[in-house]
Amino acid sequence: MNLKLQLKILSFLQFCLWGSWLTTLGSYMFVTLKFDGASIGAVYSSLGIAAVFMPALLGIVADKWLSAKWVYAICHTIGAITLFMAAQVTTPEAMFLVILINSFAYMPTLGLINTISYYRLQNAGMDIVTDFPPIRIWGTIGFIMAMWVVSLSGFELSHMQLYIGAALSAILVLFTLTLPHIPVAKQQANQSWTTLLGLDAFALFKNKRMAIFFIFSMLLGAELQITNMFGNTFLHSFDKDPMFASSFIVQHASIIMSISQISETLFILTIPFFLSRYGIKNVMMISIVAWILRFALFAYGDPTPFGTVLLVLSMIVYGCAFDFFNISGSVFVEKEVSPAIRASAQGMFLMMTNGFGCILGGIVSGKVVEMYTQNGITDWQTVWLIFAGYSVVLAFAFMAMFKYKHVRVPTGTQTVSH
């Protein structure tokens, strides 16, 4: 099989299995299993708990002892088993435990798939910068397609979404076994555990600007978790109104939500221009403003014609909110730190956004939703306005505290890291 096609299938399956349940599990737990907001928040925070340390730990295993191919296959085997078990779970405590174990297995694969892809491309004499992005985009396509399949199959509120995820995980394991062997690098054999775990990057907190940047990374990472947890659940809440129960938005909430991912792929293309023209601080400010709009538009959106326009606009600005912080933030880290700790600093950035930010967003937003839910009815407008208010506070705090003087460079020389 052609190398690029092989890696495209790998990326497609990696994110297709995640897309089958990540944005709809909250709806299934809230509507079908009747979990409260705090319980749902706890389940989703498990992704953050796993993201704090598991990628680094299994990255070390793949670097020093066991081929990345086999670590990757073992992780997805565990993932298939736990998703199969999750489909049969009906209590918050059991769901938290099963999804936590699943997260321990899945989160490291986000880095391992890059390791596998980079090695194969470099071994074939290809350029990662030019050849990898067109491969990675198939991951986003897979995520979107899974959302559509689950929605059109009527499984958004069903445990069947988890069976689909388990089946896709099993298929991915079998496909991984067909890949060529990837040798253990052993390049880090003489490094200390402190260096291997990326703990050297904690020294960056001595730099005031970097410390502020990482703290805001966590606070903004929390906003992404809010969307993953409750966006789909919110759209399904309109089925309690007879006027909206049969509307396309309620019946196929995942398809509407997938506009967010489509927008994300388009906004990536604008990052080089905005970074070179306006600088990291202004680009990140645009991201925070986009989060304000994301939540405010949700607050006033509904399945009416005008409300639908507001909901679609909310999905579109999500692409800006996500990319202008996550991608631009990665570029900022790349340019600000010394080459010696660049990889550790990138790991720190991911730890703050996908780890601690995920935990914070899961716990706090779950409590907010629980607080404004009475007799199974959630006051979503108030909930979204609270999150929008949180974003407004972040915007003013970021503007006042983060100091950065931009030196404009030609667009063509701006490097964007994916």
Curated annotation (Swiss-Prot):
It is a multi-pass membrane protein. InterPro entries: MFS_dom, MFS_trans_sf, Nuc_H_symport, NupG. One of its GO terms (molecular function) is cytidine transmembrane transporter activity. One of its GO terms (cellular component) is plasma membrane. The keyword Aminoacyl-tRNA synthetase does not apply. Changing Q225A: No change in the binding affinity for uridine. Changing Q261A: Abolishes the binding affinity for uridine. Binding of nucleosides to NupG requires the presence of hydroxyl groups at each of the C-3' and C-5' positions of ribose. Residues 1-4, 59-67, 114-135, 179-209, 269-280, 327-346, 404-418 are cytoplasmic. It catalyses: adenosine(in) + H(+)(in) = adenosine(out) + H(+)(out); uridine(in) + H(+)(in) = uridine(out) + H(+)(out); thymidine(in) + H(+)(in) = thymidine(out) + H(+)(out); cytidine(in) + H(+)(in) = cytidine(out) + H(+)(out). Residues 30-36, 89-91, 157-158, 237-247, 301-305, 370-379 are periplasmic. CDD domains: MFS_NHS. Belongs to the major facilitator superfamily. Nucleoside:H(+) symporter (NHS) (TC 2.A.1.10) family. One of its GO terms (biological process) is nucleoside transmembrane transport. Its main location: membrane. This is Nucleoside permease NupG. Keywords: Cell inner membrane, Cell membrane, Membrane, Symport, Transmembrane, Transmembrane helix, Transport. Broad-specificity transporter of purine and pyrimidine nucleosides. Can transport adenosine, uridine, thymidine, cytidine, deoxycytidine, guanosine and inosine. Can also transport xanthosine, but with a very low affinity. Transport is driven by a proton motive force. Inhibited by the protonophore uncouplers 2,4-dinitrophenol and carbonyl cyanide m-chlorophenylhydrazone (CCCP), and by valinomycin. Inhibited by the nucleoside antibiotic showdomycin. The chain crosses the membrane at residues 5-29, 37-58, 68-88, 92-113, 136-156, 159-178, 210-236, 248-268, 281-300, 306-326, 347-369, 380-403. Changing F322A: Abolishes the binding affinity for uridine. It comes from the Bacteria. The keyword Cell membrane applies. Gene3D superfamilies: MFS general substrate transporter like domains (1.20.1250.20). Induction: Transcriptionally regulated by CytR and DeoR. It is found in: Cell inner membrane.
